[in-house]
């Protein structure tokens, strides 16, 4: 099962306090496990505030979105992850997720924010979600997650508070109508 570049939508019955009603973009999936970013939990920090805290002395005239930094997951919460559209510029620590999306963990991408070199679309997250080999596949088989193809509209344009509902609409049915457990006659 190939899960890279997919969205995980938490089933309504998922009771985990961190992942209940979450939407996660899977950035990497291989035989070692999976890594993703939660798209609908935010910190109380805006991108502009993050840039200031990182002590970047940016040139005047740069404008930063008032977008909040996402709480990308419970792992490595002190580490930044920037998911962005591909650019002509190469960043120090970038991973190609798709032909059009990259995940960067180096500060050099932040230095481009507010300039023509900046990615057209991006989101900034602190922390990520990870799964060991086979763990995510088991959670999917246990009906914890629904899987749909990702799209840039959900990733970058839908407000975080509406993400779970918007992602569910990609399914073509309401997950609340599903039964969480199979029955036998």
UniProtKB/Swiss-Prot annotation:
Family affiliation: Belongs to the UPF0301 (AlgH) family.
Entry GO CC: cytosol
Organism: Mannheimia succiniciproducens (strain KCTC 0769BP / MBEL55E)
SUPFAM superfamilies in the cross-refs: VC0467-like
UniProt cross-references to PANTHER family, sorted A to Z: UNCHARACTERIZED PROTEIN YQGE, UPF0301 PROTEIN YQGE
Gene3D superfamilies: VC0467-like (3.40.1740.10)
Protein name: UPF0301 protein MS0260
